[in-house]
Amino acid sequence: AHRMGTSRSNLVNMILAEKVEVKTPEQQMNDIFSGIEELLRTSRELVPLFAPNTQRVTVRSSLEYKYHPTVRYEVELVRGFVPGESIGTLTANFRTTSQGLLELLTRFSRCLARIESRTLPFDVSYSIENGKFSRSLAYPAKRSRGSNDTGGTLLDAGEISRAITDYVSLIDGMLKACVGGADADTLYDMYVSDLEKRDILL
């Protein structure tokens, strides 16, 4: 267990899961995070930082602002997904001491919350404090084209990886547009345009 970087109880779960061909929650998370890492392998904007057997993956980006401050998007998943409940949290952590940039980021976070309250068929929670913005990730489900109705069937790890990666890419693009001077209407249009192409909401 020590050599694999995991606990003894988790190792037992992994062995049992292998025998009955069922994924443990830890294996499911590893598959999702490995998928995110693979999807971002060729990205010039987002750099994934993933350590196996953890409950989180970090994606690094930089802003076109004075001194090119770094933003780290941290995706942390819960152990075992339950239909109708949040599967985790996306946190954007801004490495900056610029008061002007922090105020801009706070405005962006509030703008995103307003946009999603108007466009998503479910509620998500937000928090903003000390240069850190967090948003809960809803239980992922496919929706019918032209409808926001979602089902309750859990998707496979590859589909969840894609949905999370696409969402982080959207938030990063909107944030960079905001830093570049985009107004609330422009951000709304960006979000809605992306939403129309999304098969999975979270």
What are the roles of these predicted feature ranges?
Residues 38, 48, 57-61, 73, ...:
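Hydrophobic transmembrane signal anchors and adjacent membrane-proximal interface regions, especially
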